[in-house]
Amino acid sequence: MEYRSLTLDDFLSRFQLLRPQINRETLNHRQAAVLIPIVRRPQPGLLLTQRSIHLRKHAGQVAFPGGAVDDTDTSVIAAALREAEEEVAIPPSAVEVIGVLPPVDSVTGYQVTPVVGIIPPDLPYRASEDEVSAVFEMPLAQALHLGRYHPLDIYRRGDSHRVWLSWYEQYFVWGMTAGIIRELALQIGVKP
């Protein structure tokens, strides 16, 4: 199923009907979480960030708000909400969490849990100067169009890893972020 137009109700009903299967073995044991913020509009948006070029890891990359689970977090969901507040000033109380996607093993040694949440359209995003250089919204229907993602096989430490690449306006979306978006599309029944 391809989406030229996707309403929030369509997205929510498909996400709720096709619950993710979470029971898979992971390679990494350090926990992290990202928030997949879906902006509540008749034609919903997907909120993304561009990481600061001054960061040691993933500098300048497009990403979801998120990071490592710390000792104060009660769950991976709490970690995703805390990180979203720290990075782009999304109050945890403004997020309607609708579920999680299966965890993803990162090349940096984390098991990353994507948390899907609905946010209001009128939030005043404020990028953390230390971590985020830009905050932008991509139409969800465009983000979930699988034809926009192109595979690239990378060989690292003797193993082959497939990563996905795409552009949105001036933003290069690739790696784990593109993979998570593709997983979300597949989860709601978009066919490759």
Curated annotation (Swiss-Prot):
One of its GO terms (biological process) is nucleoside diphosphate metabolic process. CDD domains: NUDIX_CoAse_Nudt7. It comes from the Bacteria. Keywords: Hydrolase, Magnesium, Manganese, Metal-binding. InterPro entries: CoAse (IPR045121), NUDIX_hydrolase-like_dom_sf (IPR015797), NUDIX_hydrolase_dom (IPR000086), NUDIX_hydrolase_NudL_CS (IPR000059), Nudix_NudL (IPR023735). Residues 29-160 form the Nudix hydrolase domain. Pfam families: NUDIX. Its EC number is 3.6.1.-. The keyword Cytoplasm does not apply. Mg(2+) binds at E83, E87. It is an enzyme of class 3 (hydrolase). Its cofactor is Mn(2+); Mg(2+). Probably mediates the hydrolysis of some nucleoside diphosphate derivatives. This is Uncharacterized Nudix hydrolase NudL. It comes from Escherichia coli O6:H1 (strain CFT073 / ATCC 700928 / UPEC).
